[in-house]
């Protein structure tokens, strides 16, 4: 059965522990911040934190959705922390980041679904760190393109929204999110002239043809940056891994994506949407 699949050697994870890792951890904790690195049990946390990079998660740590692949806490979120934008901006300054990546939980409980908090965070980061480029990984805002426009108007350099998986499997693993709604979000980002980026997981039972079809869909929507990584089951409550995709097939996907016309492609077992994000500017 899928949940008993043995993890292959190519998925060995590097643990952190150097001085820079400790400094990153200290900055994050002292400013009472959340990161997707910890909440999502990211396999690259050791490497990234040891390089002094982290992906900040705003809007609190409790998500209003319960996607079957995700390890983030779900339930009724706390009110937004008005100090969070300033704390994120100051942490970026202390870490001396040239490129900052921000994501968020879904806040379907808020009238504007968290869009104004996104805007405040991006603008505060840019005020405090004028030389830092900003990449944001946004939710679908329930398909409300007026809210997507608000984020675009805050002028981040890259806006990412993850498709997560192929069309057929999407309803099984994404809570409330819809494949075509995500495409509409990405299309709006690209239409506004911002670099549009998306990421998917493989190993959920998709076929090669379905992955190639997704590439065509997002390319047609205007996406220029694509990341592909192995789905890893973060806990027993999450959907089990269907398959551990070989490095050779990841390379095949990378070549196919490049041939189709994507400008930047990351495709390897441990790739996540914010992995080596500074290269995507």
Curated annotation (Swiss-Prot):
It catalyses: [[Fe-S] cluster scaffold protein carrying a second [4Fe-4S](2+) cluster] + N(6)-octanoyl-L-lysyl-[protein] + 2 oxidized [2Fe-2S]-[ferredoxin] + 2 S-adenosyl-L-methionine + 4 H(+) = [[Fe-S] cluster scaffold protein] + N(6)-[(R)-dihydrolipoyl]-L-lysyl-[protein] + 4 Fe(3+) + 2 hydrogen sulfide + 2 5'-deoxyadenosine + 2 L-methionine + 2 reduced [2Fe-2S]-[ferredoxin]. [4Fe-4S] cluster 2 binds at residues 63, 67, 70. Its EC number is 2.8.1.8. The keyword Transcription does not apply. It holds the Pfam family Radical_SAM. One of its GO terms (molecular function) is 4 iron, 4 sulfur cluster binding. It comes from the Bacteria. Residues 49-263 form the Radical SAM core domain. Pathway: Protein modification; protein lipoylation via endogenous pathway; protein N(6)-(lipoyl)lysine from octanoyl-[acyl-carrier-protein]: step 2/2. CDD domains: Radical_SAM. One of its GO terms (cellular component) is cytoplasm. SUPFAM superfamilies: Radical SAM enzymes. InterPro entries: Aldolase_TIM (IPR013785), Elp3/MiaA/NifB-like_rSAM (IPR006638), Lipoyl_synth (IPR003698), rSAM (IPR007197). [4Fe-4S] cluster 1 binds at residues 37, 42, 48, 274. Its cofactor is [4Fe-4S] cluster. Keywords: 4Fe-4S, Cytoplasm, Iron, Iron-sulfur, Metal-binding, S-adenosyl-L-methionine, Transferase. Binds 2 [4Fe-4S] clusters per subunit. One cluster is coordinated with 3 cysteines and an exchangeable S-adenosyl-L-methionine. It is found in: Cytoplasm. Belongs to the radical SAM superfamily. Lipoyl synthase family. NCBIfam families: lipA, PRK05481.1, PRK12928.1. This is Lipoyl synthase. It comes from Parabacteroides distasonis (strain ATCC 8503 / DSM 20701 / CIP 104284 / JCM 5825 / NCTC 11152).
